[in-house]
């Protein structure tokens, strides 16, 4: 039986274990963080045939990958590509894929640069760290004073020498937008969810991240949304991808992507989700 390494032991591990075992793939946990990694002992490492998604901790992941020598369904380059929100926006725009109007700011810059960048948009605007996930650090600025206040905090973080990514995005705000996560496996949309805040949490809030209390409800993904998500995966060259879409009455745009998406309940995906995922894993292992 093929052995698949997962660097996560959370929801995705538990949800995909049995469906993949039924398709000839055994899953094991390849721990990449909160441990001591012996770098000079390859003999004692667990044996795997293929990795699922490269560890989010890139430094530890690179060391572990050297010890195990694995092919990955989504490799280090895929994770880096998707994590770079500004790079994704630029690449998709170049591919004629609709995205929000966005300016990337690379610190350190003067206040006048921020004012000029925001002047190209209209308030309110969204401010987000370029590399963070789960909606962490994302804020809405309703005017120039609030924007500059948010930027002050980002500047404090970016002043720390160990901060790797010293960039952030200023992005147009799409009011009352519906928020979708569409999954693409091996170039084909395999289902998706709409993310909504429950009624008791919705008052005065606009973020729809599941990690911030939103609920993900399975939907029949419309044809236009499917084509758009598939086009995103093709443009970025990533085989297993979560594509975040925002839809208003007039527009459908790609907001972000995730090359390390959490797998939701099977009922929220198309019937062939696990079949396609298993075939992708097996082909990745065979291509080495």
Segments and roles (model prediction):
Residues 258-269:
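Glycine-rich phosphate/pyrophosphate-binding beta-alpha loops
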Residues 69, 81-168:
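Active-site nucleotide/adenylate-binding loops and adjacent lid/helix of ATP-dependent enzymes
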Residues 28, 73-74, 100, 126, ...:
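Structural detector of well-ordered beta-strand residues that form the stable sheet scaffold
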């Amino acid at each position: 039986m093929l052995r698949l390494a997962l660097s996560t032991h959370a929801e995705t591990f538990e949800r995909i274990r049995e469906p993949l075992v039924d398709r000839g793939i055994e899953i094991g946990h390849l721990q990449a963080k909160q441990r001591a990694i012996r770098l000079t002992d390859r003999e004692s490492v667990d044996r795997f045939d293929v990795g699922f998604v490269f560890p989010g901790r890139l430094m530890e992941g690179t060391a572990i990958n050297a010890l195990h020598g694995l092919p990955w369904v989504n490799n280090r380059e895929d994770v880096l590509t998707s994590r770079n929100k500004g790079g994704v926006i630029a690449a998709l725009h170049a591919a004629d894929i609709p995205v929000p109007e966005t300016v990337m700011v690379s610190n350190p810059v003067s206040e006048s640069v921020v004012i000029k960048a925001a002047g190209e948009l209209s308030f309110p605007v969204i401010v987000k760290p370029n590399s963070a996930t789960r909606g962490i650090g994302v804020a809405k600025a309703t005017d120039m004073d609030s924007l500059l206040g948010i930027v002050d905090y980002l500047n404090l973080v970016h002043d720390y020498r160990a901060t790797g990514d010293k960039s952030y995005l200023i992005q147009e705000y799409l009011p009352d937008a519906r928020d979708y996560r569409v999954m693409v496996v091996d170039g084909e949309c395999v289902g998706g969810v709409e993310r909504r805040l429950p009624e008791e949490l919705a008052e005065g809030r606009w973020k729809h991240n599941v990690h911030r209390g939103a609920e993900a409800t399975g939907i029949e993904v419309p044809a236009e949304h499917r084509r758009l998500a598939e086009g995103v995966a093709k443009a970025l060259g990533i085989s297993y991808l979560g594509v975040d879409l925002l839809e208003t009455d007039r527009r459908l745009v790609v907001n972000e992507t995730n090359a390390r998406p959490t797998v939701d309940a099977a009922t929220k995906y198309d019937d062939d989700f696990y079949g396609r995922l298993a075939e992708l894993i097996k082909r990745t292992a065979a291509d080495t």
